Amino acid sequence: MKSHYNIWIAESYSCQNDIIQLLKNSNLSSHLTIFCSHSKQRPELKLHADYFFQQPVVKDSSDWLLEQCKEHSIHLLFCGKHSQFIEQFREEFSRHDIQLVTGARGISKHKNVNNKFLFGQICEGLNLPSISAAKVAHVNELKQAIDEYQQRYSVICAKPVYGVYGAGFVQLSDDVSYFMKFQSNTLCNTQQFIEAYAQLEPPIEYLIMPFLQGQECSVDIACSNGKILALVTRIKFKFYQECYIEHPCHEICKILVEHFQCDGLINIQFKQDDQGAWHILEINPRPAGGFSYTQHTGINLIAELIAEKLHLVLKRPVPTTVVQVLPIIQSIKNGL
C-alpha cells in the first residue's frame, strides 16, 4: 500500500476551496499532494492547493484532464461540476490507473439523476416518496398542466427538467402582480410565466408540480460504489444552519445511493408536506455549496471519501449529534 498520493480536484462549484481546506485540515494531509484546476480565475484555490492550473470549461476538459493526470502521476481525479462530461471517459482514466470520482458510476446513472422527471419516475417505481410532476415542452402543454395541477393542489410551482437546483424554479400564483417577479425571483404570476414561456425558442422542458410548504433539508453524503460512508443532514434557516448526524431521511438516502450507484461527495434534497412527511426533491451528484457546514459535527465528509478510495486511515473525533452553525464572512488581502 502506498503512503503518498497525488490527487486532483477539478472544477467544482463554490465549495471547491472548502474541499481542499478540509483535506488539508485532516490527518490525511501528510499523505496527499493536492492539485486543482478551474476554468476561471480562483485566487483562493492557489492559496490552499499545492498546485493550481487553469483548465478548459468542464464540457471540453476531459482530454486536458487526462493528459494532466498522466503528466503529474495523479492517482485520483475528483470532479465536482458537470461531471457527466468526464464520466463518459471512465475507461480511459482507468487504463492509466487513475481513480475517477464523478458522483455516480456509469453515464446512465448520471442521466437518471440529471433528468428530474425521469428521476421522479424511478423513485415512484421504487415506492419512495417522490413528488407528482407533469413534464411540458410546449406552451399548450404548459397551460394544460397548470390547469390540472391548480385543480389538484392549493399551491403549484415550476422548475426545469435539467439544471442546478433553484435555477429557473418559481412558485406560481394567480394573485400576485407581474412586478413581483422583480421583487422575488421565486414567485411569479401564473399568466406572466405562461407568456414568458411562450417566447422561448426553442422551449425548455419544464415540470409543473405541487409546491410543498414544509421544511426543507439537504443531506450531504460521502459514498463509494453505491454505499454510504458518512452523511450529515443540514436544515437551513435565515441566519444559520443546523446539522444532524441522525435524521428520518437517512434511510431513504441509503436506498437512493445504492440504486443510483452514487460514488463521491453528493447531495440529496428533501422537503416536507403539510403533514410533515418528507418527499424527495432531487439528487445532485456533486457536493453542495454549503456542505462544509457539516464539518462542525466532527464528520469530515470529503476526508471520509478520500480515505476510503485511497485506503488511508482517517482519525475521527467523537461526533456531535446536533450542531448549530453560523456563517462568518471575512475578507483578506491577496498579494498580486
Where are these regions (language model features)?
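Active-site nucleotide/adenylate-binding loops and adjacent lid/helix of ATP-dependent enzymes
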Residues: 110-205, 225
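Residues that mark the start of a beta-strand
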Residues: 4-8, 155, 207
